[in-house]
C-alpha cells in the first residue's frame, strides 16, 4: 500500500469489531484506533477529577487533551468507564473535538483501521472499506460474561444483557451521530461466527477492493 488506506469498522458493543480491527491492522500493517477509547478517556478524566459527567465544559476540555498515542486500554476498559463514556458521547461539541482528532489519525500514513460507532458515517465517510459488525444482544452478553469470567471476575448475565440493550438504545437513539451502518457498508453478523471466520470474511472484502484498485 503506497497511499493512505482507511478501513472503517462500526457496530454495537460486544459484536467483535475490536478484535477484528486488531487482526486487520496487524495483517495489513496499518495504524489502529479504537475510537471508543477516546470517549472513555474523556469520561476517565472527569471521574479522576471528581467532575460530574454532565459538565459539558469540562468534558470539552478533557476531549481537547486526549492524546491518541497514550490511550491505555487496560485502564480505560473498566465497565464503569464504559457506562460513563456513553453519557459524555452524547455531547455534540465533545464529539466534534474527538472526531477531528480521529480524522487526523486516519490521515497518517500508511493509513489506519478505525473502529467505533460512527466511523463509516461521520468520521471517515470516504473510507476505502466500511464494515458494520453486529451480533444479537444475547450473544454479545454471553461473550461479555465469558470475558469477565476469564479474568476471574463475576457477573450476572441478565444484568449484562440489560446493560447492552440500554447502551444500544442510547447509541442508536442519540440525535448526533447515531449508531447505524453506512449505506455502502459490508454487513458482518458474527452471532454464529468465530473470530477467525469473521477475519477471513473481512479479509476477502479488503483483498477484493485492493485487487480491483490495482487493476484500475
Swiss-Prot record:
Q: Which GO terms describe its biological process?
A: pyrimidine nucleotide metabolic process
Keyword terms: ATP-binding, Cytoplasm, Kinase, Nucleotide-binding, Transferase
- Cellular location(s): Cytoplasm
Q: What is its EC number?
A: 2.7.4.25
One Gene Ontology cellular component annotation?
cytoplasm
Q: Which residues are recorded as binding ATP?
A: 11-19
Q: Which Gene3D superfamilies match?
A: P-loop containing nucleotide triphosphate hydrolases
InterPro entries recorded for this chain? Answer: Cytidylate_kin, Cytidylate_kinase_dom, P-loop_NTPase
**RNA-binding in keyword set:** no
EC top class named in words? transferase
Q: What is this protein called?
A: Cytidylate kinase
Provide the species name: Mesorhizobium japonicum (strain LMG 29417 / CECT 9101 / MAFF 303099)
Amino acid at each position: 500500500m503506497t497511499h493512505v488506506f482507511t478501513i472503517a469498522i462500526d457496530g454495537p458493543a460486544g459484536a467483535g469489531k475490536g478484535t477484528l480491527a486488531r487482526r486487520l491492522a496487524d495483517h495489513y500493517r496499518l495504524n489502529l484506533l479504537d475510537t471508543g477509547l477516546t470517549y472513555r478517556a474523556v469520561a476517565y478524566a472527569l471521574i479522576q477529577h471528581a467532575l460530574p459527567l454532565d459538565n459539558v465544559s469540562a468534558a470539552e476540555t478533557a476531549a481537547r487533551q486526549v492524546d491518541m498515542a497514550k490511550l491505555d486500554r487496560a485502564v480505560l476498559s473498566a465497565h464503569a468507564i464504559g457506562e460513563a463514556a456513553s453519557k459524555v458521547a452524547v455531547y455534540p461539541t465533545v464529539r466534534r473535538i474527538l472526531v477531528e482528532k480521529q480524522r487526523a489519525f486516519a490521515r497518517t500514513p500508511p493509513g489506519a483501521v478505525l473502529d467505533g460507532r460512527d466511523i463509516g458515517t461521520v468520521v471517515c465517510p470516504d473510507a476505502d472499506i466500511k464494515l458494520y459488525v453486529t451480533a444479537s444482544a444475547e450473544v454479545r452478553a454471553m461473550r461479555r460474561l465469558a470475558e469477565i469470567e476469564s479474568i476471574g471476575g463475576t457477573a450476572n448475565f441478565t444484568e449484562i444483557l440489560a446493560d447492552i440493550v440500554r447502551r444500544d438504545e442510547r447509541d442508536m437513539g442519540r440525535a448526533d451521530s447515531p449508531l447505524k451502518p453506512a449505506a455502502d457498508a459490508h454487513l458482518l453478523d458474527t452471532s454464529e461466527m468465530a473470530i477467525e471466520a469473521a477475519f477471513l470474511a473481512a479479509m476477502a472484502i479488503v483483498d477484493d477492493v485492493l485487487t480491483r484498485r490495482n487493476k484500475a
